[in-house]
């Protein structure tokens, strides 16, 4: 990393990994939008997709990143020797490695909330399937405690990674995106045929799948895309869907990372546009939740 003066800053970040260690970038407590009840959400770092509308750009890279918050900088130049010497906390690590034992201890601090609300733990990302072996072992441990488990995934991985993990879950929040295979490949770098094959597999195996569809102007906010999604879901006897309207909440994160967000000037969907998508899904017999 370089300072504002263009000088190289040492970050002392070691990128070694072990099978019993995950790389995460956040643990969010008291979430009400990522499964039933009060959830503790573990965000895994690393994603194979390049969604232009991504609200968590810090999740894309699998590496630990170091960013500088200009408002906290004292301009003391101590960081030119080592970013860890920053006295004001202007430098921030995005991502950390955590062991199975440590993560188990961390989430079980919230067990009382899980039990009183019917909630539990949700694994999100990034894309949790990029660390599927760890995630599977972790959920196996939580199951021994009787904790409700869920994952949020785009399902774009070999079934051998997805299915064992999904079978440990009370809910799989399955993120659909662009429903045209060519556009999904070109825009998002997604293997849509594999995604849909995995969706059908999960349903056939009795997994509780809850599809989620972002409503993104210019990409997924269209009657055509919605109809393509419904054409997949209805034959599977899926009876609910979450619609997630586009928002600008991620824009400050792009600035923090020194990136330009191509969606910066894109407005949120109008209430009429959201209502149209909702009506299409409801006419098809789906129970609709807007916002997750």
From Swiss-Prot:
Keywords: 4Fe-4S, Carbohydrate metabolism, Cytoplasm, Glucose metabolism, Iron, Iron-sulfur, Metal-binding, Oxidoreductase, S-adenosyl-L-methionine
Positions that bind S-adenosyl-L-methionine: 53-55, 126, 175-177, 247
Domain 4Fe-4S ferredoxin-type: 62-96
GO CC field: cytoplasm
EC id: 1.97.1.4
Cofactor note: Binds 1 [4Fe-4S] cluster. The cluster is coordinated with 3 cysteines and an exchangeable S-adenosyl-L-methionine.
Binding site for [4Fe-4S] cluster: 47, 51, 54
Main location: cytoplasm
Span of domain Radical SAM core: 33-287
UniProt entry tagged with the keyword Iron: yes
UniProt GO MF annotations: 4 iron, 4 sulfur cluster binding; [formate-C-acetyltransferase]-activating enzyme activity; metal ion binding
Cystine pairings recorded for this chain: none
SUPFAM superfamilies per UniProt: 4Fe-4S ferredoxins, Radical SAM enzymes
Family annotation (Gene3D superfamilies): Aldolase class I
Catalysed conversion reaction: glycyl-[formate C-acetyltransferase] + reduced [flavodoxin] + S-adenosyl-L-methionine = glycin-2-yl radical-[formate C-acetyltransferase] + semiquinone [flavodoxin] + 5'-deoxyadenosine + L-methionine + H(+)
Listed cofactors: [4Fe-4S] cluster
Any single biological process term in GO: glucose metabolic process
Protein family per UniProt: Belongs to the organic radical-activating enzymes family.
Function, as annotated: Activation of pyruvate formate-lyase 2 under anaerobic conditions by generation of an organic free radical, using S-adenosylmethionine and reduced flavodoxin as cosubstrates to produce 5'-deoxy-adenosine.
Matching PANTHER family: PYRUVATE FORMATE-LYASE 2-ACTIVATING ENZYME, PYRUVATE FORMATE-LYASE-ACTIVATING ENZYME
The protein's name: Pyruvate formate-lyase 2-activating enzyme
């Amino acid at each position: 990393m370089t300072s504002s003066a263009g000088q190289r800053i040492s970050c002392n970040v070691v990128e070694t990994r072990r099978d019993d260690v995950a790389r995460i970038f956040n643990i969010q407590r008291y979430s009400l939008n990522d499964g039933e009840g009060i959830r503790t959400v573990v965000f895994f770092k690393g994603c194979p997709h390049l969604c232009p509308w991504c609200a968590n750009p810090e999740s894309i890279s699998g590496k630990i990143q170091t960013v500088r918050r200009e408002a906290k900088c004292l301009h003391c130049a101590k960081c030119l020797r080592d970013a860890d010497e920053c006295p004001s906390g202007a430098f921030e690590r995005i991502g950390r490695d955590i062991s199975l034992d440590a993560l188990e201890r961390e989430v079980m601090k919230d067990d009382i909330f899980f039990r009183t609300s019917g909630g539990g733990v949700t694994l999100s990302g990034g894309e949790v399937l990029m660390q599927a072996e760890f995630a599977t072992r972790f959920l196996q441990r939580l199951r021994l405690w009787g904790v409700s488990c869920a994952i949020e995934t785009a399902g774009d991985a070999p079934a051998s990674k997805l299915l064992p993990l999904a079978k440990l879950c009370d809910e799989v929040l399955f993120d659909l995106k662009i429903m045209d295979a060519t556009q999904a490949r070109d825009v998002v770098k997604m293997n849509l045929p594999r995604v849909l094959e995995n969706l059908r597999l999960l349903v056939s195996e009795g997994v509780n799948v809850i599809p989620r569809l972002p409503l993104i102007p210019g990409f997924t906010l269209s009657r055509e895309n919605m109809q393509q999604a419904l054409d997949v879901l209805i034959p599977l006897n899926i009876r609910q869907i979450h619609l997630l309207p586009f928002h600008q909440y991620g824009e400050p994160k792009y600035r923090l990372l020194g990136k330009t967000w191509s969606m910066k000037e894109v407005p949120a969907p109008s209430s009429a546009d959201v209502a149209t998508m909702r009506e299409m899904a409801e006419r098809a017999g789906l129970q609709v939740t807007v916002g997750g």
